[in-house]
């Protein structure tokens, strides 16, 4: 199946990509992971905190599992992703496909 995905992080922006996946669930999983990777690329920049900065700001000990859990919750709240079935009549979908050199990235 063919999809258009958008993924990103609050306060930074987003990316769009044309993908082909076996089903909607796999497309959603890929978009979710892409959002995490996108955010990770900005850690320490534009106000995106890394784990040490998060712990310092929230006065948490970096050695506790609870600190990691709180950090992961923060990340989940910052990232976003959307998956749309490809519609060849949708201008935005066609633009995304064109930016992908007319190809769907197989996931």
Regions found by a protein language model. Name each.
Residues 23-42:
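A short, charged, amphipathic alpha-helix used as a generic interaction element across diverse proteins
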Residues 3, 24-27, 59:
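N-terminal cationic leader/targeting segments used for protein routing and processing
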Residues 13-24:
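A short, exposed loop/beta-hairpin motif centered on an aromatic-Gly-Thr core
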Residues 5, 20, 74-76:
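Residues marking helix boundaries in flexible regions
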